[in-house]
Amino acid sequence: MTDETAKNGPDAAADAQIEPQVQEETNSTAEDAGQDNNPTAALQAENAELRDRFLRLAAEMDNLRRRTERDVKDAKSYAVTAFARDMLAVSDNLRRAIDAVPAEAKEEAQAGLTALIEGVEMTERAMLSTLERHGVRKIEPEGQKFDPNFHQAMFEIPNPQVPNNTVVQVVQPGYTIGDRVLRPAMVGVAKGGPKAETAQAADA
């Protein structure tokens, strides 16, 4: 067999297939070796990865801190919610007792009755002041536009003199605690008057 025949035989075809694979593996090995021989690049890549992890962890910790602060603040602000709501019933009863005494009777009352009335009024003021120190605020809606977030409409009163949906009577005062409604104010609202926008334009 001549040399030319050997070059064109089956072995030559096999060698032709193997050579690209060997060359590719050689190139890959060379690239890996190049990376292994460049410690600076490896350290930079590792540093970038660690920095990314650190930033993510810092962001998570900051979010956790904010949530914790908010939860603690809410716990402090609204811890007395149930107690305050119960005390509102006591305050209502004190006010009813005061209002039950006619004005004429107050004027003509003897010293003992006058002292009793003043004592009940003082107790009511002290209770409301204590609730206020704990974030409970009284809603004073008379004359304001009806707001379903803070007011509960009990009835309508025909009144063409004031803008429609204006609170003209307070049946039971409402209260808020922090940013929340502890109890909506029960009110009567006007109907038959001009719309609020029209009334404001007329005033302007």
Curated annotation (Swiss-Prot):
It is found in: Cytoplasm. Coiled coil: none annotated. The keyword Aminoacyl-tRNA synthetase does not apply. It comes from the Bacteria. Residues 1-42 are annotated as: Disordered. Keywords: Chaperone, Cytoplasm, Stress response. The keyword DNA damage does not apply. GO terms for biological process: protein folding. Residues 23-41 have a biased composition (Polar residues). Pfam families: GrpE. SUPFAM superfamilies: Coiled-coil domain of nucleotide exchange factor GrpE, Head domain of nucleotide exchange factor GrpE. GO terms for molecular function: adenyl-nucleotide exchange factor activity; protein homodimerization activity; protein-folding chaperone binding; unfolded protein binding. Its main location: cytoplasm. Belongs to the GrpE family. Participates actively in the response to hyperosmotic and heat shock by preventing the aggregation of stress-denatured proteins, in association with DnaK and GrpE. It is the nucleotide exchange factor for DnaK and may function as a thermosensor. Unfolded proteins bind initially to DnaJ; upon interaction with the DnaJ-bound protein, DnaK hydrolyzes its bound ATP, resulting in the formation of a stable complex. GrpE releases ADP from DnaK; ATP binding to DnaK triggers the release of the substrate protein, thus completing the reaction cycle. This is Protein GrpE. It comes from Allorhizobium ampelinum (strain ATCC BAA-846 / DSM 112012 / S4) (Agrobacterium vitis (strain S4)).
